[in-house]
Amino acid sequence: MLGVQAQKPPPGQWTTPPFDPRFPNQNQTRNCYQNFLDYHRCVKTMNRRGKSTQPCEYYFRVFHSLCPISWVQRWNEQIKQGTFPGKI
């Protein structure tokens, strides 16, 4: 039987995002998109207030865990070009 130390993930490894009651269904596409928006809104708000963006790291970890890399890259390119359809 494995000990408690052997069951812990190594440092720096991602864990599964916790359950979000806003998205109870198996399809997590909307959850991915919403956490991407929440992260960018959080960073924008914290920068505007001159505070640390550390509280925004939760949203970053969740959307990086749920979203395909190609989606995130496309959304970031759209943000840079000013063509992103979401409200940030």
Swiss-Prot record:
Gene3D superfamilies: Cytochrome c oxidase, subunit VIb
Subcellular localization: Mitochondrion inner membrane
UniProt motif Cx10C motif: location: 56-67
Gene Ontology CC: one annotated term: respiratory chain complex IV
Positions of the UniProt region annotated as Disordered: 1-26
Cysteine disulfide partners in this protein: C32-C67, C42-C56
Keywords, ordered alphabetically: Disulfide bond, Membrane, Mitochondrion, Mitochondrion inner membrane
UniProt-recorded name of the protein: Cytochrome c oxidase subunit 6B2
Organism of provenance: Mus musculus
Chain's gene name: Cox6b2
